[in-house]
UniProtKB/Swiss-Prot annotation:
Gene from which this protein is expressed: lipB
Chain residue ranges for the region called Disordered: 35-112, 134-236
Stated name of the protein: Lipoprotein B
Organism: Mycoplasmopsis pulmonis (strain UAB CTIP) (Mycoplasma pulmonis)
Main location: membrane
Keywords: Cell membrane, Lipoprotein, Membrane, Palmitate, Signal
Signal peptide residue numbers: 1-27
Length: 236
C-alpha cells in the first residue's frame, strides 16, 4: 500500500513540478526584464536633466553675450555722439572767439554775429520732436489763417448785403416821397371840414336851395348865405 501511495504521489509531484518550473522561470525572466527597463529609464531621466541644464546654460550665455553686444554698441554710439557734440561745441567756441575778435574791431557788427551764433545753436539743438511740433504748429497756423479768411469773407459779404438793403430802402423812401402827398385839412369859419384837394365849390341843390334861402331870409335878410361863407373860406 505504501508503495502504491508513493508512486501515486510521486507521479503527482513530478507532474506538478513539470508545470510549475517553466512558470517560475517565466515569471523570473519577466521580473528581470522589468528591472532592466526601470534601470534604463532612470539612467535616461538622469541624463536628460543634465542635457536640459546644459542647454539652459548655453541659452543664458548667448543672451548675456547678445545683451553685452547691444550695450557695447549703444555705448559706442553715445561716445560717438558725445564726440560729435564736443566737436560742435569747440566749433561754436572758436566761432565765438573769432566773433569777439572781429567785434572788437567792428563793434557795429557785434549784434549781428551774436544773433547768427544763437541761431546756429538753436538749429543744432533742434531734435526730431521739435521738428514734428513745428510742422504741427505750421498746420495749425494754416488752418487758423484759412478760418480767419473765411470769417472775413463772410463779414464782408454780410456788410455788402446790408449796405445794398439800406440803399434799396433809401431809394424806395425817396421814390415814395416824390409822389404828391394830400394837402392838410383846413377848417372854415363855420367849423365845417373840407379837403383842400377838392377845387370844386359847393353848390346846394335847387329844392334845398329855395328852402334854405327862405329860412335865411327869415332869420337875417342882410347876412350872407352859408355857402357863400364856405366859398369865402376856400378863397382864403
Amino acid at each position: 500500500m505504501n508503495k502504491k501511495y508513493f508512486k501515486k504521489y510521486s507521479s503527482i509531484l513530478i507532474f506538478s513540478m513539470s508545470i510549475l518550473a517553466p512558470m517560475t522561470l517565466a515569471s523570473c525572466s519577466y521580473n528581470l526584464a522589468k528591472e532592466k527597463d526601470k534601470d534604463q529609464k532612470e539612467s535616461t531621466n538622469l541624463s536628460e536633466p543634465n542635457k536640459s541644464n546644459t542647454s539652459k546654460t548655453n541659452t543664458f550665455q548667448d543672451k548675456k553675450d547678445s545683451t553685452n553686444k547691444i550695450d557695447s554698441q549703444e555705448s559706442s554710439k553715445t561716445q560717438s555722439q558725445n564726440t560729435s557734440e564736443s566737436n560742435q561745441n569747440t566749433k561754436v567756441d572758436s566761432s565765438k572767439t573769432n566773433n569777439l575778435a572781429t567785434n572788437q574791431n567792428n563793434p557795429s557788427k557785434s549784434n549781428v554775429n551774436i544773433q547768427e551764433t544763437n541761431e546756429t545753436k538753436q538749429e543744432q539743438n533742434i531734435n526730431p520732436n521739435n521738428a514734428v511740433i513745428s510742422e504741427k504748429q505750421a498746420e495749425n497756423d494754416k488752418n487758423a489763417s484759412s478760418l480767419n479768411s473765411k470769417q472775413i469773407n463772410n463779414t464782408l459779404k454780410n456788410q455788402d448785403k446790408t449796405k445794398q438793403e439800406n440803399d434799396q430802402f433809401k431809394q424806395e423812401s425817396k421814390d415814395s416821397s416824390n409822389f404828391t402827398s394830400p394837402k392838410p385839412i383846413t377848417h372854415d369859419p363855420i367849423n365845417k371840414v373840407i379837403s383842400s384837394q377838392s377845387t370844386t365849390r359847393l353848390e346846394m341843390p335847387k329844392n334845398d336851395q329855395s328852402n334854405s334861402e327862405s329860412e335865411d331870409n327869415k332869420k337875417s335878410p342882410e347876412s350872407p348865405k352859408w355857402w357863400e361863407k364856405l366859398n369865402q373860406g376856400d378863397a382864403f
